[in-house]
Regions:
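Membrane-embedded catalytic cores of phosphoryl/pyrophosphoryl-handling enzymes
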Residues: 108-200
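Short, hydrophobic transmembrane alpha-helix segments
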Residues: 35-47
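Short, Lys/Arg-rich, polar N-terminal cytosolic tail immediately upstream
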Residues: 1-15
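The first (N-terminal) embedded transmembrane alpha-helix
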Residues: 18-38
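Alpha-helical transmembrane segments
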Residues: 44-59, 117, 147
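Juxtamembrane helix-capping/reentrant segments at transmembrane boundaries
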Residues: 15, 74-91
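Core segments of transmembrane alpha-helices
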Residues: 27-29, 89-100, 139-142, 187-188
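Transmembrane alpha-helix boundary signature
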Residues: 66-73, 99-112
Length: 200
């Protein structure tokens, strides 16, 4: 019995670690910087990538942390569905503002298309979240792989197992059901691929 309890504890610890490492804000940092550097070179790409991250991830996540600190949100993953729509709407407005800034900075088409895909993904996720709890972690993971595969290299598809790992983690810690994770992954990859194939 103690061995089974220990195994369960280990799985949950691993699931929480995966949840943090594969959180949307981390993935936004990764994908914006990779796409920006790939399309604009090291120096300019890094600068533009940081600008894109600020509007797409940094600012919204900062507001989430403030909300948690003030007791307005349960946690930084916003586990309660009813708390998500307002934050996601604010994030959507922030990303749209980022698009305007990137256009003004004459950002590369690939980076601009990436942020357009983020806007579309957020809009769809917000619509679903208004009545059902979708896995934003799974959507972000699948969307990240799709974006990197289309905008940088198909070799990035080799990271697809990380989407499965992320889904497992969210189910293991009981933040989502398998269906919520599966729908999140489908929405994330589908919206990203659809938008990029039209815009990029």
């Amino acid at each position: 019995m103690s061995a089974l309890l220990s195994q369960g504890h280990t799985r949950r610890r691993m699931a929480r670690l995966v949840t943090e490492v594969m959180s949307p804000v981390v993935l936004i940092v990764v994908v914006t910087l990779i796409v920006a550097v790939h399309s604009a070179g090291a120096v300019r790409g890094m600068a533009l990538g940081l600008v894109a991250f600020f509007f797409a991830g940094g600012l919204p996540y900062g507001l989430v942390l403030i909300g948690v600190r003030r007791g307005l949100l349960t946690d930084h993953h916003i586990s309660r569905r009813e708390q998500r729509p307002l934050i996601m709407a604010i994030a959507l407005a922030s990303v749209v503002a980022g698009l305007v800034v990137l256009r003004w900075l004459d950002a590369p088409r690939a980076l601009f298309a990436l942020v357009v895909a983020m806007v579309a993904g957020l809009a769809v996720a917000l619509a679903i979240t208004s009545f059902w709890k979708i896995s934003i972690h799974a959507a972000s993971a699948a969307g990240t792989v799709a974006c990197l595969a289309i905008l940088v290299s198909p070799w990035w598809l080799l990271l697809a197992p990380l989407v499965v790992l992320t889904g497992w983690a969210r189910v293991e810690i009981r933040d989502h059901t398998p269906v919520q994770v599966s729908v999140g992954a489908i929405v994330g990859a589908g919206v990203a691929a659809g938008v990029l194939l039209l815009v990029a």
